[in-house]
Structure formats: structure tokens, C-alpha cells
Amino acid sequence: MALFRKLFYRKPPDGLLEICDRVFVFDCCFSTDSWEEENYKVYMAGVVNQLQEHFPEASSLVFNFREVGTRSVMADVLSEHGLTIMDYPRHYEGCSLLPVEVMHHFLRSSESWLSLGPNNLLLMHCESGAWPVLAFMLAALLIYRKQYSGESKTLDMIYKQAPRELLRLFSPLNPIPSQLRYLQYVSRRNLVSEWPPLDRALTMDCVILRFIPDVSGQGGFRPMFRIYGQDPFFVDDKKPKLLYTTPKKGKHLRVYKQAECELVKIDINCHVQGDIVIECLSLNDDMEREVMMFRVVFNTAFIRSNILMLNRDEVDTLWHIKEFPKGFRVELLFSDMDAASSVDLMNFSSLEEKDGLPIEVFSKVHEFFNQVDWVDQTDATRNMFQQLAIANAVQEGLDGNSSPRLQGLSPKSIHDIMKHAAIENSAKFKLSSMSEVETIDTPEKPPTDSVKKFIAEDVHSVLQINNQEQNASEDATKLLHQESPSLKLVHHSATVKPLVDDSKSPENAEENFPKSPSAHDGKAISFSPPTPSPPHPVRPQLAQAGAPPPPPPLPAAASKPSEQLQHSVVQATEPLSQGNSWMSLAGSTFQTVPNEKNLITLPPTPPLASTSHASPEPSSKTTNSLLLSPQASPATPTNPSKTVSVDFFGAATSPHLGASDNVASNLGQPARSPPPISNSDKKPALPRPPPPPPPPPMQHSTVTKVPPPPPPAPPAPPTPIVHTSSPPPPPPPPPPPAPPTPQSNGISAMKSSPPAPPAPPRLPTHSASPPPPTAPPPPPLGQTRAPSAPPPPPPKLGTKLSPSGPNVPPTPALPTGPLSSGKGRMLRVNLKNSPAKKLKPYHWLKLTRAVNGSLWAETQMSSEASKAPDIDMTELESLFSASAPEQAGKSRLDSSRGPKPEKVQLIEHRRAYNCEIMLSKVKVPLQDLTNSVLNLEESALDADQVENLIKFCPTREEMELLKGYTGDKDKLGKCELFFLEMMKVPRVETKLRVFSFKMQFTSQISELRNSLGVVNSAAEQVKNSEKFKRIMQTILSLGNALNQGTARGAAVGFKLDSLPKLSETRARNNRMTLMHYLCKILAEKIPEVLDFTKELSSLEPATKIQLKFLAEEMQAINKGLEKVVQELSLSENDGPISHNFNKILKEFLHYAEAEVRSLASLYSGVGRNVDGLILYFGEDPAKCPFEQVVSTLLNFVRLFNRAHEENGKQLEAEAKKNAAEKEKPKTGGLDTEIKKPLNEEVKEEKTKTSGLGKEMSDRLKERTAP
């Protein structure tokens, strides 16, 4: 079919460029030259005449994009030739795109016209400055007809047809991000039952900017927002209006610094519906000059979860702007209009001395805390004025955003008005007048029957101009000019609504077109108002940012020189009838085959020998895959759609050929290509000592007859080299002839060594005696030679192996025969049992010299050698062999015959090895694995396994390599088979990511909801705690008592940073702090507030949460949901393989959207409560983050509890002390009473004792007297 089209392809006439089948663009649209009116008429007439000669049976329909209200010279020329013209606006509120309803009208009109007959042609034309809109609409048409896929690729392909600077000349801002957003609306139309969907009326709550840019050059900016769109309160009026602008009065405009705030939240509270344009500008210090920061265009019908998150690549910015940081992000938070709530504002009256203690309570506080500085050395009066200014700014924000027409209306009455207006709008399904369509008579040539039918049908859906609404719009415009003199806006009353109904089949398309009345013969249909709208200059920020457009190619009237700068907008209205049925040509096969000169064929694969000298270390597995690739990878044909683009547009770039790149990349790896086995390549890889005698011819013939190596089998274990060494002083004895068996093994190993380099080959036995080595490891294989004696004939075979010697990794040689006196004498080996296979190594630390007097020096003596027992090698082999004996014998047999292929490895060895490890952990058959992915079965796999599968998805190069393999698939490795199985699933990596998102969605939603609930609960608890409020009021009274008579006194509030200073301010005796005194006063006066911490239970868990991480989680969920929507749209075209996948994913999407919408509402509400909490303490939400607030409050709670406990302990200690002091007087009186009788008794005893002594002395005297 492609060859047939190529043979019968007809070059389009001069002056036209063919975009796709039967769709042409005038080449004057790609030029910036100015045309004289007469020259332009001659040029256009010549193009039309050539077109009619080229396609004599064809009927043409022209779509023209121009400035509304201006004269079109092209319409005058084309109408003379009987061509039908349909005019569309050139922009929407200065943006290079059109509303969704106008897009739908254009797409259905184009599709219906092309489906009416094979001879119908579609011509596209744009006047000066409208090229960006024309390119956008052409890309939408190609995606709508499913001729191209991929929004970015299609749009870029269209823009390449014109010089690149043309887009920047006509658009000072880069419109591509918003255009791609609207193209996604078109490509994903199959996800909704009705397209375009009904408009949603939403309330834009706020705009959050993260990582703010530096626009002013001083580390910050002063943002200002303007919002344009349809007013949802006036459903019948679809003209775009200025819905919101940031007031320039008061404190609404403030400067945000990057060093002060990472996040900026600006409350909007604006009702929006339909196509919305949001402009963010930065106002200079003079409050006059505006600089455009970015612009966002979207439709509210496609806001699925009431939140729109955009990064710096998804907003329209000035060309080459560099002020935006990498992490810049815009978050637009919405809510349903009936569920919108305002931001909780701070009420400064709550900080008055109402419920707190009066100031008289602290009359004695001066004697404790006089001359103590516990407040920052700043002006307290200035702080108070800043707090009052914040309150005024908040109040003015509410007053500035209120609409005058809504004053006095309750929310319920507003909702009833909107509901009633929506019912009336749905009933008004017909336009009021058909006489206001701008037409141009062409009496020369009547149109064809198909044109008459198309005109008669399309008249019901063209742009209508309602003259009765013009006065009302002019009054509204004057009112807007009076409100904001700096804004110069023009609101046109032009409206449009598509005519098409998708309910009827293409077969009835011809019957559904009614006969055209003769009054419409030769008339052109215009989508612009008959009277030009009043001109207005370009917005100042756009005029300054971009270069002025060049003179238009079409001449304009001399009396209206400024009409070229008008930005008029045409908006859609309701259709006239629903009885129309136009064909849908989705999946059309109209394609054109490129010429032979544009076809790119794959070059022939170069011979393998051309890369054989690149590296001395080959890889047999990779060599095998390369040997198979010339036969298994033929030239891959180019994609028809890609070659069409080359032929149609003459682009200098060629289609990408994955197969060619793959072959080139493989052949460009010299380390993976072994040298071919030929006479010319038999050179030694390293220089050698004196060469041996020339080898016999038998060896030469043996080597040259080796065929190209197939995939290798396990190589045979090498025969250890036997060294019969002697001490260095005596000369070496003559070498004996080598045994015949090792010789034959050496020959066989030499034959098999080139194709099997991974293992060392078997070498012949050397009987030469080298001197003692000076290094621990022995020389590498292939380089083992006797330097002190010429090599005997058997080593000639061994030296012949030197060309492949470097390819063999160096391994230590194991001795196998009886050794003479010297090193290693303790090892006595029976020569009959010399090992025939490799043994397991003993990893010891080898000594190279025996120190005199050591064990090993004594071992070198002959008398000690007999003490070591003989080693039975048979038993040693049976116990410590590296492989089974039968396997070793089989390996020797296989090596003598040549390696046999076992597994073909096409994927890089390390990646294949890691992939097999991953598959061993999955433990699911490959067939069941793909079925689990397509059926989204969470029972078969867990989240970690799915993440591992994503890491090992085949790349494009690996897919091309596997597609080119034509051998036996049973010989492929496990990794290759896994890749082949995964390749059966279209876009397997995207499906796995969607699967992973689905598996983790419930847990992510639950965790984020819990975290948001903790933050919300903490904010509510702090604001609603009456006990905490009375404590804060008491602190205010305490501070005013301390600062009475100073500049810090008479405060109405204090900042949160003042709370920690309660513990830092100490009394004169240093035994008490202000926090202790506060607890003491509260315990004495209002003890019921001391347990306020029980009301703040969520405060501590809230300190462990950062709002930044919550925002990132919310963005990840939204991005994942977007990927689900995108994959669901693409998988609709996969066929039966994705049928069950689509069904399950649609159910999940319906559930996930409801969950995300609910979560977004909670996210928005938490943001409002957080701001309300910060404002509750008189702080600025832009400078005082939530984390700082809760951490300060938690610290205050802990210090308060500690001080209260210390006060309790102090009171207990004082009570014990007082009790002890009271017990002291009683104890002293008891002691005196006890001591008094004791003294009397002592005296009596003394008296008695003295009396007895006197009596005894008298008796003695009497006896002794003579």
C-alpha cells in the first residue's frame, strides 16, 4: 500500500504545503513579509487557480484565523472563486490557543468536511500574528483524527514547518505549556462519555508558590494576579471578563523575599468556570511598571481533583527566563462553589484582658523582677503597629474581594440564582437570529452541492453576533475602566458554539445535511463580528517583554492602524440544533508514502573481521550474538508516519532507526569482538624471548581449520604445569621429554582456547628448572617459559598458544609430579596418581623465603623430607575436586571436539545476572507475571517486586536486539526470555508504574489523610482551647505589669518568640523565673487552667510533621493520577490484550478521583486552618511557618509543666520545713522538765553519799582512838 501511494503521489500546487492527506496550508503563513494589497490579490488568485487545475473535481473549504473586527482581503479574493471561508479568532485573551468549545467546533467541522467525500480539501490560512494559533489547531486536528500520537511530538513537528523565530516574534511568552495542556484535553477525550464535558463552576481558594523566583533582582518579587474567564453567575454571557485582580491599595501588594519565606500563599476566593487565564505579574517598587512572571491557561471541566499542580516547565513564561529556581511549583487549590469557605481570620479582641487576671494582681511583681530585660531590644510600639497593620490588611482583603452585585445576598439565595440560571441556559438551545452572520456574495461561480450542504448545516453553528448585548458589554467595560484605570480591556460580544452532535452514524451524514437555500450560494461564513471592536493597546508587560510584531502580510485600512494590536476574543455559545450528524474519521488511514530519496535504509553489517584487531580480550558469548546479528537483524523499515513527515515537510532530520543504532553500538564495542582465526592474525600478543623453532606444518593446519566458535560449553580444567626445579647454583639438568598424555591434552586445549577464553586451557608439562621466583604468584599461563634453558620441542606447542595468552586470566599452577630437593619438599605426591582435573584451592598465605632457624628452613633439608607422608591424589581428587569426575571427563571430551552452545546471552552479562537474581525472588512464572500485570492482580506481586520489575524493564536497544534474534528461543537465557515476555505488553514500563501506583494508592491516601488530620486537629485545639487562651491573656497582663511606664508597656499582644523568655527571666534572688511565678499565680487564682495541656493532645504529634513533605506527597498522588489517565487513554488503542486492563483501571480511576478530590478538599481546609492558627497569634503566615508555631507552643507546654512541678516540690519542701520548725519549741520544754527531777535526785544522792562518808570516817576515828 505504501508503494502504491508513493507511485501515485501528486505534489501539491505551488503556494500550498500539505500537512496531511487533503489538508493544506498557505505558505504565506510562514512569512513575515508585508504584502501590498494588489500583489496579495494576484498571489492568492494564482494559488487558487493552480489548485483548481491540480484538483479539478475537488471542493475546498478555507479556515482563516484573523483578528476579529478587521477587514480580510483574503476573504474578498477567495469568495470570488467560490470558496467557502470560516473565520476563527487569532487568540483567547492574548493566549495562542482557543477555548475548548471553539476547538470542538473546528475539529468537528474539519472532520465532517473531510468525511463528506474523497475530493473535499481543507485549506488553512492565518493572518499576521496568528501562526501560533494555526499551528496549535493543526496539531489538535492531527491528534483528533489519530494520525499522530504524542502531544509534544506533534506540536513540535508543526512548528518546524516555519522558522523557529516566528513563534517568538508573535508570542512574547512561550505558549507551548498551555497548548500541550489543551492538546491533552483532545487526546484523552475517550476517557469521558461526553466531550467536551460540561463546565464546572469552582471557587479558586488560593495560589501557593513554592521556591519563589527572584524577579526584582533583590532576592524576591511583589506578586500580582489577574484572572480572566467566564463569570459563573451569568451563565448566558460567555464573554471572558476580568474576574479578579489584586488591589493595589493597602497591604495587598507586598514584597516576598527568598531568604525569608520558601512558600507564598495568596488567597484568591474567586469563582471561575470554563476556560480560565491566570496571569502572575511582579510589580516594581514604583507600583506602576509590571513584569510578567508566568501565565496559566486551563479549563475547569478537566480539573479532576480540585487541585492543579504545575512546575516551572508547565507554565507559560518569557523566553529564556532564568529567574525561576529548579524546584519552583504553582499550586492552585479549588473547591466547589457551594462548599467554599473563607479563611479564618485573627480576632485581636481575643487578646484583651477579659478572662485573664487583672493587672492589680501583679502589684508586687516589681519587687521581684525590677530592672530585668526580658523583651527584645526593639521598639514595642513599632511591633504593635505591625500587628495592627496585619489585621487591617486581612480586613481590607475581604472588603476588596467582595463583589458589589453580591452584597446583601445570602449564600443560599446566590446558589438558587445560579441553579435557576443554569436551567434557563440549558433550555435556550437555539440562537436568536440568523441574519447577523457575516457573508460575502460571490456571483461569479456558485458553490458545489457538497459546499451547499455543508454551509446549510454549518450555518446553525457559526459564530453569532448579538447586537442587543453590545450596549451592556460597553457599560461593563466602562465600569471596569473606572474601577482600575490602569487596565485597558475590551470585552466583545462575539460568541460561538459547536454545531455537532456525536450521536449519529457516519452513514447518515449526507442525509442529515438539509438542502441549502439559494440565498446562501456563494457566501463565506465568518466567525467574527461585523463591526470592529474598539482597539486597545497590548498589555504593558507583554509589550515590554517581546519584540513588536512585523508588518502584517495583509493590508489593513488606513483609518485603523492600531487594529493589528487588538486582542479580541471570541467565545462559544449554545448550538442551534442537535439534529446534525457529522462523520467521525477516527483511526483514518490517510497516509502518504515518502519518495525514494527520503527513505532511509539500514547499511549492510560490516564483516566481523573488520573489528577483530580492536582488543586482545574477546568474549565468546558476545561474539556469538554478533555472529548471529547479520542474519537475524535485517534492515528495519521506517515507520510510515515518520516517513510521511519527512516527505511532507522536507525536514532535514531523518526518522530514527533503532535497529541501525543498535547494530552500530554493538559493532562499536571492540572489547567484545574476538580476533578471527586466520593466518593473518596469528601474531603473539606480547613480545617473547628468543623464539622457538618453527612449528611443524601439522600445527599450522590444525589452527587454521578451526571454524568460527559457537557459544561455548564449560571449558575443560587446565592441566597444572609441572616444574622440576633445583637450587639456583647448579646448572639445570637437560630436560626430559614430556609425557605423551599431557601433550595431547595441550593440543586439544590449544584448539579450544580461542573460543573459550573464560577458563585457562590445558598446557603441556614443562620439565625445565627455573630459578627461584622472586614474587609469590607464578607467571601467567601462556607465558611459562624456562629462561635459563632453551625450550624443548614439546614446549613449542605451548609457545604457539601465546597469541591467545593474554586472553587467559592468570592462575597459579599446581605441581603434579615428584619434586626434587628445594621448595615444596614436604608435598610428596605419587606420580601414578597425578591429578587429571582441577582441585579446590587452599587459600593460604604463601612464604617465598625460609628464614634460617625456622621450621621451613629445616624442612628444606633432605633428612626432614621423609617425615611428611605421601599424598594419595586419588583420594584427594575424590574429596576436593572442583568438579565431578564424569563431568571433568566429559568436559575434556567436549573441549577436544569444540565447545557446544548451551545458552545464548544477548543482554549484558551483569544486567542479565542481576535480572535472574530478581526473578528468583519473584517466584512467579513468566506467563503468569504478564497476566498479573495486565489484570492488575495485587495478590500475585507486592509493591517491592513491582518496583524491581520496573528497574528491569527492557530498554529500546535491548528490544531491538531481541527483535533481531532469529535463532532458537529455547537457547536464550532466563533474562532474555523475561524480556521477550515483557515485550508482549504494550508500554510495559508505564503499565508497571500504574500498577505500582494502584497498589500503594490506598496506603498513601490513608497516611496523608492521617497526617493532615493531625495538623488540622492541632490547629483546632489551640484555637478552641479556652484554658490556653486565659493563660496567654494572663501572660499579657504580667508583661504589661512588668513593662508599666516604659515603651514596652501597654501592649495589645506579643509574639510567640516571647514565650521561651519566660524561663530565661530570673528574679533578683535567682531562685525563681517568670515561668515559675506565672504558674504560682495561676495556681493561686485560677487553678482550673493548669491542666490545659490535656486539651492540646495533638500538639506533640504535629511537631513531627512538615507541611513541605505533605505537599510533596500530594503532588506525587496527583502526578500518579495523571499517569493513570494518560495510560488509560493510550491503552484504548492496544486491542484485546489491554481490554481487561482498561476495565479495571477505569474502575480504579473512578474511585481514585473521588478520593483525591476529597483529599484535596481536606488539604485546602488544612491550609486555611494553618494560616488561621498563625494569624491567631498575630504572626505573618509568609514569615512564620507552621512548624515554628507548633514547636514553640510545645516547648512552652513542657517548660510550663516543669515549672509547675518544681513549684509543687518547692511547696512540699517548705511545708516540711515549717512543720519541723513548729515541733522545735515543744521538744525544748519537755527536755527541761525531764532534766529538773534528775538534778534533784543527783543532789540527794550526793548528800546521802557525803553523809555516809562522814559517818564511816567518824567510826574509823573511834576505833583508832586509844
Swiss-Prot record:
Alphabetized InterPro entries for the sequence: C2_domain_sf, FH2_Formin, FH2_Formin_sf, Formin_homology_domain, Prot-tyrosine_phosphatase-like, Tensin_C2-dom
Polar residues bias (residue ranges): 617-644
Keywords: Hydrolase, Protein phosphatase
Protein family according to the UniProt entry: Belongs to the formin-like family. Class-II subfamily.
The protein's name in its UniProt record: Formin-like protein 13
MF annotations from Gene Ontology: phosphoprotein phosphatase activity
Compositionally biased residues, Basic and acidic residues: 889-902, 1210-1248, 1255-1266
All residue ranges annotated as the FH2 domain in the record: 829-1226
SMART domains: FH2 (SM00498), PTEN_C2 (SM01326)
Domain Phosphatase tensin-type per the UniProt entry, residue ranges: 9-193
